Amino acid sequence: MMKESSKWIAAFVEIIIENGDWTETDRYYLTNRIAKLVGCDFFEQPEAVACEQEPLRVVEHLLNIAQANHQIDDSITEAEQLEAELMDFITPTPTIINQKFMDYYQESPRKATDYFYQLCKTNNYIKTKAIAKNIIFPMDSPYGKLEITINLSKPEKDARKILAEKKMSQKKYPACMLCMENEGYYGRVNYPARTNHRIIRLNLEDEAWGFQYSPYAYYNEHAIFLDQQHREMKIEKKTFQRLLKITELFPEYFVGSNADLPIVGGSILSHDHYQAGRHTFPMDLAPMEKRFSLKKYPEITAGILKWPMSVIRLQSDRQEELVEAAELILTKWRNYSDERVSVRAYSKDGTPHHTITPIARRKGSLFELDLVLRDNNVSEEFPDGIFHPHPEVQHIKQENIGLIEVMGLAILPPRLAQELREVEKYLLKQPNQIAESHRAWADELSQQTITEANVKEVIQQGIGTIFVQILTDAGVFKRDEEGRRAFERFIQCIEND
């Protein structure tokens, strides 16, 4: 055991010196520090250092050693805390990372993001092994090829829990998962270890913001921009200014914000933040099916997207005009009601119900803003939300429809992985334990010709069809004739203003 422990300690020290800001002078120091962390009070330099160069694989061996030495128990929490502490040795300090990032940025934004992204994968802040477990498949639809993900790397939240967390978050340290004080935080039960976490500091419109990657990425280079202050999500003029500024700083990234109201917002409403990345979403490729003009801003190209949700696209090479036009549409939408299609801006008590999910990107020399109209009204028929996944599709997805799904990438809950295996057995008429919530849907699917060769494809296509319905449910102005006329009435309100 002693030789085995020494072998992996020596291997990790080798990786630290090669990947971190340490030198040969630090070898004894590092050896003793690592040995202590894994519970070894003796070290014997191996004749040959293990050639394994993948940090995570070596750290997994060290975690096994630590558990055998009773340094940690068999809980996930203690293992993750020690893993993050070990990975911190190959992670430069915040000062050094920020300096290196800026040095690379002087060469190009791409070199800077490549450096930071690779570092966050190497030190396992980005959970590549967990992310690889996700089930991903494309699905053809009337709106192009949509993306479906069954998320096996991160637990799901329901809308009520999200709202409860918003109310409770002020009494915690860190105040929430996005606060900058997470950088280097050791973690605790029910709160993740962040010892190896780093944040790039940015100035956005004369405000201090941070840039980091998501540990549970849903797409390529899934990034987060976060306010240094812990303040609630708010869609306003400054939101559009910041989003467009980010696309100027990082022209290869899209960036968008979740809505700032419950039901139609994301999983964290208590801290202003945006999500970004190097990924082309299905909505990016959606065409404008009806163009219109804005009297005040004749240079802006504007139109309604061919998309199941209600989306206005604006394009221009002038950031300031785009910001002003977006603010005009936001203001109009916040105060717009149309009882004919159950669209109500305010409750009788003055509670606001309208907001926007905005997305910004670059298209060559043009800046592009997509403004997705959102409404979080509820009713007796739809207590979870009128423009929220309706009961008949909640066996697949009952959570909020946030920014990522708005753009055509479904993030479905982990429970489906096992439940769909039972649906598969049911369709093949094999012994099964199908969830009652899926039975009616499975009976519909069974009307097709089902074989062992095509059953997975049939189920996936069925999920894709439901995802389109989910987006349609979340759309304020429906895709039928009544909905189109209602959307045009709203457009008329902003065209001549």
From Swiss-Prot:
Protein name in UniProt: Galactose-1-phosphate uridylyltransferase
GO molecular function term, any single one: UDP-glucose:hexose-1-phosphate uridylyltransferase activity
Reaction catalysis annotation: alpha-D-galactose 1-phosphate + UDP-alpha-D-glucose = alpha-D-glucose 1-phosphate + UDP-alpha-D-galactose
InterPro entries, A to Z: GalP_uridyl_Trfase_II, GalP_uridyl_Trfase_II_CS, GalP_Utransf_C, GalP_Utransf_N
Domain of life: Bacteria
HAMAP family on file: GalP_UDP_trans
Family recorded in the similarity comment: Belongs to the galactose-1-phosphate uridylyltransferase type 2 family.
Entry keyword Protease: no
Coiled coil (residue ranges): none
Cellular compartments annotated: Cytoplasm
GO biological process, one term: galactose metabolic process
Main enzyme class: transferase
Keyword Transferase applies: yes
Pfam families, A to Z: GalP_UDP_tr_C (PF02744), GalP_UDP_transf (PF01087)
One GO cellular component, as annotated: cytoplasm
